[in-house]
Amino acid sequence: MSNANNNGQATAKGGCCGGGGSQDNKANQNSGIVVSNTSTDNRNKFDKGFKLVLLGEMNTGKTCISSRLVRNEFGPTDSTIGAAFLVKSMVVDNINIKLEIWDTAGQERYRSLTPMYYRGAAAAVVVYDITKKNTFETLKRWVSELQKHASPNLILALAGNKVDLPNREVQVDEVNRYISELGNAIFFETSAASGQNINELFTEICRRLIENYK
């Protein structure tokens, strides 16, 4: 199934995010993992918990997307070192879902670490920048790695981020053709700046997860 929206708001200053905003993540330099201050008070309230991994080239907006989803914030971010870990609780179709989100680094030097993060993932969101064609071409490599190494039941979603920026280089029709080759992947164009389609993207992922694991 393909879900695309051609409207969105995004900006690209100071890494993947622009404008103001707070950064509440604390880094563990030894492990290369950033643990979000967002936490859950009572894990027993969740009916289902799932691991989700964010993949894609650096500066495509992975961290901005996760920050918008988890904290409803948008602002400048530093490049992720290794991976960042966040938790988001959602109620979808009257089911309490806990998403354990691994936001992976997009730099080439961290590429060898990536399989460690997406192994055991129930879902993956691969992000590209609609104004940079090369990030969509690289997305195909991420998808290929997932197909080889991840669970065959993995829920795959593609996110075309920064949709309001000028000079679009990746057309929706091109993405839809690629998705038709993949089969049942989810696709949304998103805006971390405005929040457009962020909740919709993850809600659809949760629905697929519920269907897969009910």
UniProtKB/Swiss-Prot annotation:
<feature type="binding site">
    <location>
        <begin position="56"/>
        <end position="63"/>
    </location>
    <ligand>
        <name>GTP</name>
    </ligand>
</feature>
<dbReference type="GO" id="GO:0005886">
    <property type="term" value="C:plasma membrane"/>
</dbReference>
<dbReference type="GO" id="GO:0006886">
    <property type="term" value="P:intracellular protein transport"/>
</dbReference>
<feature type="binding site">
    <location>
        <begin position="103"/>
        <end position="107"/>
    </location>
    <ligand>
        <name>GTP</name>
    </ligand>
</feature>
<dbReference type="GO" id="GO:0005525">
    <property type="term" value="F:GTP binding"/>
</dbReference>
<dbReference type="GO" id="GO:0006971">
    <property type="term" value="P:hypotonic response"/>
</dbReference>
<comment type="similarity">
    <text>Belongs to the small GTPase superfamily. Rab family.</text>
</comment>
<keyword id="KW-0342">GTP-binding</keyword>
<dbReference type="GO" id="GO:0140220">
    <property type="term" value="C:pathogen-containing vacuole"/>
</dbReference>
<dbReference type="GO" id="GO:0005811">
    <property type="term" value="C:lipid droplet"/>
</dbReference>
<dbReference type="InterPro" id="IPR005225">
    <property type="entry name" value="Small_GTP-bd"/>
</dbReference>
<feature type="binding site">
    <location>
        <begin position="161"/>
        <end position="164"/>
    </location>
    <ligand>
        <name>GTP</name>
    </ligand>
</feature>
<dbReference type="GO" id="GO:0003924">
    <property type="term" value="F:GTPase activity"/>
</dbReference>
<feature type="short sequence motif" description="Effector region">
    <location>
        <begin position="77"/>
        <end position="85"/>
    </location>
</feature>
<dbReference type="InterPro" id="IPR027417">
    <property type="entry name" value="P-loop_NTPase"/>
</dbReference>
<keyword id="KW-0547">Nucleotide-binding</keyword>
<dbReference type="InterPro" id="IPR001806">
    <property type="entry name" value="Small_GTPase"/>
</dbReference>
<dbReference type="Pfam" id="PF00071">
    <property type="entry name" value="Ras"/>
</dbReference>
<dbReference type="GO" id="GO:0005769">
    <property type="term" value="C:early endosome"/>
</dbReference>
<protein>
    <recommendedName>
        <fullName>Putative ras-related protein Rab-5B</fullName>
    </recommendedName>
</protein>
<dbReference type="GO" id="GO:0012505">
    <property type="term" value="C:endomembrane system"/>
</dbReference>
<dbReference type="GO" id="GO:0030139">
    <property type="term" value="C:endocytic vesicle"/>
</dbReference>
